[in-house]
Amino acid sequence: MTVSKFVQIRRDLHRIPEIGFKEWKTQQYILDYIGTLSHEFVEVKTWKTGVIVKVNGKNPEKIIGYRADIDGLPITEETGYEFASIHEGMMHACGHDVHTTIGLGLLTKAVSERIDDDLVFLFQPAEEGPGGALPMLESEELKEWKPNIILGLHIAPEYAVGTIATKEGLLFANTSELYIDLKGKGGHAAYPHTANDMIVAASHLVTQLQSVISRNVNPLDSAVITIGKITGGTVQNIIAEKSRLEGTIRTLSVESMKRVKSRIESIVAGIEASFQCEVIIDYGAMYHQVYNHEELTREFMEFVHKQTDMNVITCTEAMTGEDFGYMLREIPGFMFWLGVNSEYGLHHAKLKPDEEVIEKAITFLSQYVKWKGNRK
């Protein structure tokens, strides 16, 4: 069956998922496609494994930005697609292939239907980690092309195709990775009194961490600590000398993130004293909350409702993490959910976005950009 140009682009990208700052094939694919759009008013830069494209407007007064994340996840794909990932153990399980395709489609429209204002497209690596938005924002490559307004999207499996969802103000949570290493003294299982058991210490720590949420965070201000991985020990009859916890912290407010981390550190100090061990905390990557500019978001929602065939709804905050929050901290703009009607959710090995969304998104975003970027 013949598919449209942009559906084929999405499938091409889906085959080559790459993890953060290793998106070399993806970068080259984007550059090759941009090369087919060559015009004297199009400028291209690379930044690490990302791509920055500027379409110079006819009579610019501002720069409008669109950000698309381009990286995949370390997940083994189970979609059954004919165009499934060719990279073992990697998959576009968060829809970044769709985000990138929509960006290339919007870029194509921008070249053929040039507007007054400048447009900058940020094809950003490493959203899934360690985080590409903040260093890209601070890069020399973007300094002269820094947008005055910026928008981004994320696919939403739970919403129907043709629906977008967003809200003014806080949309996504503050998030932080959490790694805790415990080191004690190993020994024979028959002589526990001669050792410091780090499996037991880690177990106590996991349960105590949950009290941070129930007893140290305002019930009206959501927060979550998830320990997703525990490792420790070697065999069944040796008391573990080491153990490791890996997880995430998510809070709706910056203040709660600070409070949660402070309490974690206090609890860890207690574990060290109780079990006579050494505990090291590493917070890893932290993503700033996604906070939509109220006026721009309201204006965008009204435009979509009145001038496009898309359905726009107001959603609630999500505990999702997104490094686009760093861009919105410095640049007025917004992010929205884009419905893709998938039975399986984000980060699932069977995620299958409905490809009908691609043309719809390119069309309505192009309408918005022309409305926003042309003199009235």
UniProtKB/Swiss-Prot annotation:
A single GO BP term for this record reads:
diaminopimelate biosynthetic process
Keyword Hydrolase attached: yes
Q: Which Gene3D superfamilies match?
A: 3.30.70.360, Zn peptidases (3.40.630.10)
User: Which Pfam family, an example, fits this chain?
Assistant: M20_dimer
What EC number(s) has UniProt assigned to this enzyme? 3.5.1.47
**Which pathway does it operate in?**
Amino-acid biosynthesis; L-lysine biosynthesis via DAP pathway; LL-2,6-diaminopimelate from (S)-tetrahydrodipicolinate (acetylase route): step 3/3
**Which Cys-Cys disulfides exist here?**
none
Positions annotated as active site in the UniProt record? 69, 128
What reaction does this enzyme carry out catalytically?
N-acetyl-(2S,6S)-2,6-diaminopimelate + H2O = (2S,6S)-2,6-diaminopimelate + acetate
Signal peptide location? none
GO MF terms listed in the record are: N-acetyldiaminopimelate deacetylase activity
Please name the InterPro entries in this protein's record. AcetylDAP_deacetylase, Amidohydrolase, Bact_exopeptidase_dim_dom, Peptidase_M20, Peptidase_M20_dimer
Taxonomically, the superkingdom here is Bacteria
Return the NCBIfam families for the record.
Answer: amidohydrolases (TIGR01891)
Give the family this protein belongs to, as stated in its UniProt record: Belongs to the peptidase M20A family. N-acetyldiaminopimelate deacetylase subfamily.
The record describes the protein's role as: Catalyzes the conversion of N-acetyl-diaminopimelate to diaminopimelate and acetate.
Protein's recorded name: N-acetyldiaminopimelate deacetylase
Phylogenetic lineage: Bacteria, Bacillati, Bacillota, Bacilli, Bacillales
